[in-house]
Amino acid sequence: MWIPKDENPQTFPKKKIDTPMMMLSVFWGVNGIIAIDILQKPNTMNAQYLIDNVLTQIINSDEFEKSKQQKQKFAIHFDNSRVHKSHKVMNYLVENNVKVVPNPIYSPDIAPSDFYLFGTLKKRAEGREGDLENFVREQFEQFSHDDLKRVFQAWIDRCERVIESNGDYI
């Protein structure tokens, strides 16, 4: 953009370079959050971390306990990352009677959290500083039972479209 010699250029604030990176893992059902974990960089997700910090929360949750009392198998869905599909994680889930809902191999964009919820959370969190975990919990509390049911239905519809398109990108 060209400006006259006697005018000062408009300034724009720079993004903070030192903003810490983190990985947010959220498992939820129609009744709300079941497990949440925030992994700070430089740490990385591996099978043991997933079991100790995320899946253990799920196994100890009220939702999991309800499924056991109703003699139903608890179902979980996640993408096809190596950590999720590792023998260690799969064995842990089998030992705890957890069913894994399969995810199409090349369809990472159908995960309900990634596709439907994280975009909303990201917009709401923009420019915000402070306790991310409490912020995420507060935001999930604002999603109604009907909102979460709609997300599940949209996910089912999207999965059906992936199946109908023989796995092609939709």
Predicted regions and their residues:
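Extended, low-complexity cationic-aromatic segments
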Residues: 1-57, 61, 166
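RNase H-like polynucleotidyl transferase catalytic core
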Residues: 12, 77-80, 94-112
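Intrinsically disordered, low-complexity regulatory regions enriched in Ser/Pro/Gly/Thr
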Residues: 16-21, 27, 67-70, 92-95, ...
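Mobile genetic element proteins and their domesticated derivatives, centered on retroelements
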Residues: 26, 54, 76-79, 93, ...
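C-terminal catalytic core of Y-nucleophile DNA break-rejoin enzymes
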Residues: 48, 81-84
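Cytochrome P450 catalytic-domain "roof"
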Residues: 58-73
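C-terminal anion-handling pockets and recognition modules
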Residues: 113-170
